[in-house]
Amino acid sequence: RQGPLNHTRDSFNPQIEELRRDYPQLIQFESATLDFSIEQIRRNLRHREALVEYFISGPEPSGKEELFIFVVTKKECHVCRSPVDSTFYQELATITQNLHGFVPYLETRERFDSLKAALFGVYQMTIDPVRSYFSNKKLIIVPDEILSIVPFDALITHLDSSSISNYAGAPYLLHEYDISYMYNSQLIDHQSPRAWRFPSVTAWLPGDATASRSSFGNLKGAVEEVQDILKLVKGRSVQKSMDKQDLVEILQERAILHLAMHSLATDISGSSPYFILDSVADPLLANQLHDYEINALHLSSPMVVLSSCETAVGQLYRGEGIMSLSRSFMQAGAPSVVHSLWPVEDAKSREIMVGFYGELKKGIPKSSALSKVKRQYLDQQPPFYTHPYYWAAFQITGDTSPVYSKRNYFLIAGSILIAFLIFAYFRRLSFFRRD
C-alpha cells in the first residue's frame, strides 16, 4: 500500500521528467552535484588561490548558532567553527547602516569609530581564525546568508586607534588579497581555462541623459562612463528607448555586457528584483525586466557588468542565499558578473568602472583588475572619499580568468623582425639574380 509521501513524490515524477527533457543541462547539474568533492575543488583552484566558504548553522537546542569556515587550497583543506553571538549580528548591522545607508553630511567621528570597530570585529570572526591556513594572494569567498552583503575587501585587519585617524589609513583586507566571490563552491568547476581573444563591449543606456544614477530619472553619469570605457576597448553603446524584448536580444549577444541602468532589489509591493527600462519618476509605472525573466535566458557573454544600484541585493532565503539580479545572470549562464551592493555616487562609480576596463585590457584576471583599481583609487583620493561607501560596493562574482588576451609584445616585435629579415633576404636575392 502506497503512503501519502510516496503518492506525492510519484505525482511530481512526470513534471520532473518533463523538466529533464526540456532542459538537458539539468541532468548534468544533478550529476555534478552528486559527484562533486573537495578534490575537485582543489584541482580547479589556480596558482595562489584559496577558497573560503562560510556556513551559519541554525540554532542548536541550546539556542546557539555557529559559524563554520571551510578553507581549501591546492594542497590542503581545513574546517574551523566558532559560536555566533548577538555582537556579530550587531557588527553586521552597523556595516549595513553605514555603507548601504551612507549619508555624507551625517558622518561624524562617532560613526567613523563605530564602522571601524565593526569592520574589524567581522574580520576577527570570518578571516582571522583561518588566516594561518593560506598565504595565497587570491581569495574566493563563498558567503552564507547575511554575509552575502559584506564587502570583505573593506574589512580591517587590525585596530590601532593611534594610526587609523581616517579611512585612508585603514589596513583594509584589500591591500593584502585580490578577492572574488562565488554563490556556490561547485561553480569553480566552470572557470574558463583561457581568456577570450578580443571581445567587444555592448553597453546599454536606456533613454536620454539628464539625471544622476541615484534618482529614478534618466542617467547622466553613466553615459560619460560608457563613453570613457569605449575609448579604451572596442564596442558599441545603445542609448534609446526600448522595450523588454530589445533588451533581451542584447543580453544574448556574444559580447561583454555593460548595463548602466536603474534597478531595484524590491519595492513597496514586495516584488522580486528588477531593472527599470524607462526614465520615469515612479519605478512602479516603468517597463520592468525581472530576475526570473533573466533566469530563463541562455547567455553567451564572457562577462556581465551591472553598473546599477543594488544588483547584488535581494530577498534572503535560508539555505538558498540572496536572490538578486546578479545571481540571475549567473543562473542564465554568465561565467562572471560584476555587481554592486549599494547605490554608488556617479563620479566615483565612473572612476572605478573605467579603471577596471583599463586594467582588464592588459590581460590580467578580473579579480586582480578590480582590486588593483580600488587600491589606486584609495591612493589618489582625499581622505573623505576613501570611505568604503565610495569604492567597496563593486564585487566580481564567478570566473576570475582574464577576459582579454595579454599581448606578448616581445613575440609581436620578434615576428615583425623575422618578417622584415625574410623580406630583405628575398629582395636582395632577386637583386643579384637581375645582375
PLM regions and their residue ranges:
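A short acidic (Asp/Glu
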Residues: 147-156
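Functional beta-strand-loop-alpha-helix junction segments that form "active/interaction loops"
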Residues: 28, 33-38, 111-114, 216-271, ...
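Catalytic cores of nucleophile-dependent amide-cleaving enzymes
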Residues: 183, 190, 255-351
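An often Trp-containing, charged/polar helix-loop segment at the C-terminal end
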Residues: 7, 195-197, 348-435
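Peri-functional-center coupling elements
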Residues: 3, 7-14, 18, 25, ...
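Coiled-coil termination/hinge junctions
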Residues: 19-54, 60
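Active-site-proximal beta-strand/loop segments in catalytic clefts of secreted hydrolases
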Residues: 54-55, 142-145, 177, 182-184, ...
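Residue-level detector of buried hydrophobic side-chain packing
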Residues: 52, 69, 139-141, 204, ...
